[in-house]
């Protein structure tokens, strides 16, 4: 099953704005602090935050989305 890696940071205002949306989404996700988990951030080449990376069960990237997007956009992206 796929899940979302939600790359974020405590100092990032758009990340803070996206947090409640992700909580309401009902989608499987793991929040990753780019300052704390630099290895995972580097693995996926994260350059901007917030970034959502959809991965398969093995951690292979399927697709990604950057920015503070509305819930419907995130759900359509994940389910598409």
Regions found by a protein language model. Name each.
Residues 1-2, 34, 66-67:
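Alpha-helical interaction segments
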Residues 1-25:
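Local sequence-structure signature of Cys/Sec-based thiol-disulfide redox active-site neighborhoods
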Residues 6-7, 26-40, 46-48:
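Thiol-based oxidoreductase modules, predominantly thioredoxin-like and allied folds used
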Residues 11, 36-38, 69:
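Residue-level detector of flexible, active-site-proximal loop/helix-junction positions
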Residues 17, 43-44:
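Chalcogenol-based redox active-site neighborhoods
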Residues 55-80:
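Non-catalytic, surface beta->alpha helical segment in thiol-disulfide oxidoreductase systems
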